[in-house]
């Protein structure tokens, strides 16, 4: 997309602004229905981006801490319904219904805590997916502007927000109906189904219980609880640079 604008700045000067979007925005124009069975989120990312004509390593990159945590129906060694052996994992269905490629991939990434950004090197806008701070690379230093025509920061603002600080995940797996979640301190049962809890360091009132996030094991529920807590932390304390 290209947004153009012309503004009269006075004193015989005009300001012409052009806003460019990366190639990833073109995926808004591809709207389909699709079903994935037993595929992990990283595998779906690679499949969709390759179908859009993007090449891994050149046009996009996955900087994930451990792709194994996104494996489909990753078991946690728990037996189901008194069984002597762990329950066999059931393939997960991931459905794209009347969604553009970009909306579909963005939704999947947001659910499991994968963010994406763009690097502009070697004349290419590379799309980078990451789930860890080191995936963003070393931060660049910019000085406050000391005069006209110099590159730097003009305005620095910091904003605090009150957010919930305790996050629960609750789900039910009919293949392992005996699973339950207990408080690690008191030992009392919190949910008689799959569950998990994550907290922020900040001590603020408020809690969120998310039901049916499609977690099939306690390990998966714990990962999602941590993701929801990290999302809230990202909104709690923000810096704005201009």
Q: How would you describe each model-predicted region?
A:
Residues 1-242:
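Amphipathic alpha-helical and helix-coil boundary elements used as assembly
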